[in-house]
Amino acid sequence: MVKLILMRHGQSQWNLANLFTGWVDIPLSFKGIEEAIEAGKQIKNYPIDLIFTSSLIRAQMTAMLAMSVHTSGKVPVILHTGEGRLEEWASIYSSESQSQTIPVIRAWELNERMYGELQGINKEEMAKKYGAEQVHIWRRSFDVPPPNGESLQMTAARTIPYFENTIVPHLKEKKNIFIAAHGNSLRSIIMKLDGLTTDQVVKLELATGVPVIYDFNHDEYIKQQK
């Protein structure tokens, strides 16, 4: 059966510092690196044909580190489609080498929710300034965005169409897919896969560096139980 693996990136340096991150391109912390490798061990025996990540380095690092322990021994290779000379110069000219790679596609549509004017701000300081209730609304409501940022609803408006139009066709071709992305972009996708209501999705928690695995069969997504 075709597999769909979703994974929130490992702890980032700003997760560690308790700062709102959003689209700021922050790398993994040392703990995040360990989480990504440990998560890789949990999926090391699952077949993977294609990898999708966001355009942010913490998701890309997570995918690469997770694949470093995969039993296939195949090498994840970032594609540079549409990037002019880089696309041409990054070509692989050995069919044997090509067969031992797994394509990695980066997409901004899978980026974390954009937190606007909260980005780079300490979460506790923000609660003191605006009140814990207001910050909770910004973080956990479905349709209320932070100042100049995205709500979860707005995030879903880009992640779900990308998933349906770009990723699902590969699943239907029986390709096993691994997506390394972010808490909110993955929550919005899981909302679709599990048929969650808006009240349910805002309560959904995704731990860093923990895979969520689905079996895909004839347009049906069956979540594997832990």
Curated annotation (Swiss-Prot):
Family matches, as CDD domains: HP_PGM_like
Record's catalysed reaction(s): (2R)-2-phosphoglycerate = (2R)-3-phosphoglycerate
EC number of this enzyme: 5.4.2.11
Residues involved in substrate binding: 8-15, 21-22, 58, 112-115, 123, 139-140, 183-184
Entry-linked Pfam families: His_Phos_1
GO BP of this protein: gluconeogenesis; glycolytic process
Active site: 9 (tele-phosphohistidine intermediate), 112 (proton donor/acceptor)
GO molecular function, one term: phosphoglycerate mutase activity
Disulphide bridges, residue numbers: none
Keyword line: Gluconeogenesis, Glycolysis, Isomerase
Superkingdom of this protein's organism: Bacteria
Role summary: Catalyzes the interconversion of 2-phosphoglycerate and 3-phosphoglycerate.
Protein name per UniProt: 2,3-bisphosphoglycerate-dependent phosphoglycerate mutase
Protein source organism: Protochlamydia amoebophila (strain UWE25)
